[in-house]
């Protein structure tokens, strides 16, 4: 565990432990880091980073701050909007993003929030990269240059990515559940856009012997 990032990201009370400035700097570092990584691999296209968030009021603030940091460093930001952490991990992997960012503090109180960074494989970000993010947050690195002119990153509405994840969930739902007495689905406010679509499929299936509970 580092100074800022714990076992499940950077969490704390919004505006105190985790501020808009923190989010901006995380975006600045990630945009710069993944652009530099691409350049070393002979790829001059801007880094692509996908962002999701939960329904906390502060999530919008952190989303804007992250986008500002990413685009200022020359990376392109793709917005899934309100969604779930698994959807960000899935889309980061299947749509070849450099990384994904989920803005959420999970079960923490409503006034908390968090930033979880997921690598392009849909897994937790590598520890050595987290160490470098923390060094940048603490001012232990040289200032990252700003992208200029046409190198400034773009921001894209990527609700289509969320729909792709819904399609993946539906593909799971079409498997046989014969013999199962209970199916449990987790639900928070962030799950609602996904759950509404998937629920339509459940309602159309003959599952007279199966009880579905949402928790």
Model-found features: residue ranges?
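Conserved beta-strand scaffold positions in the cores of enzyme catalytic domains, especially
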Residues: 4, 77-79, 100, 153-156, ...
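An N-terminal, well-structured beta->alpha segment
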Residues: 1-68, 72-73, 154-181
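Gly/Ser/Thr-enriched, mixed-charge loops and adjacent short helices
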Residues: 13, 113-215
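Ferredoxin-reductase
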Residues: 39-121
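Active-site catalytic microenvironments for nucleophilic, acid-base chemistry
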Residues: 33-36, 94, 201
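Active-site flanking residues adjacent to catalytic metal/cofactor-binding acidic residues
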Residues: 7, 53, 103, 184-187, ...
């Amino acid at each position: 565990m580092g100074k800022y990032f714990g076992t499940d990201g950077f969490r704390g009370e919004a505006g105190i432990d985790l501020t808009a400035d923190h989010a901006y700097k995380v975006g600045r570092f990630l945009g710069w880091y993944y652009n530099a990584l691409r350049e070393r691999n002979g790829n001059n296209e801007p880094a692509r980073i996908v962002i999701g968030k939960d329904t906390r009021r502060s999530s919008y603030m952190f989303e804007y701050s992250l986008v500002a940091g990413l685009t200022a460093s020359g990376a392109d930001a793709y917005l899934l909007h309100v969604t779930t952490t698994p959807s960000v991990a899935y889309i980061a992997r299947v749509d070849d993003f450099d990384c994904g960012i989920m803005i959420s503090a999970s079960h923490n109180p409503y006034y908390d929030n968090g930033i979880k960074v997921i690598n392009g494989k849909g897994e937790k970000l590598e520890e050595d990269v987290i160490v470098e993010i923390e060094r940048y947050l603490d001012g232990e690195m040289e200032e990252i240059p700003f992208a200029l002119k046409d190198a400034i990153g773009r921001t894209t509405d990527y609700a289509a990515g969320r729909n792709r994840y819904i399609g993946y969930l539906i593909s799971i739902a079409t498997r046989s559940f014969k013999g199962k007495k209970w199916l449990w689905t987790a639900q928070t406010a962030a799950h609602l856009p996904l759950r509404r679509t998937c629920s339509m499929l459940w309602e159309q299936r003959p599952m007279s012997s199966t009880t579905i509970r949402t928790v």
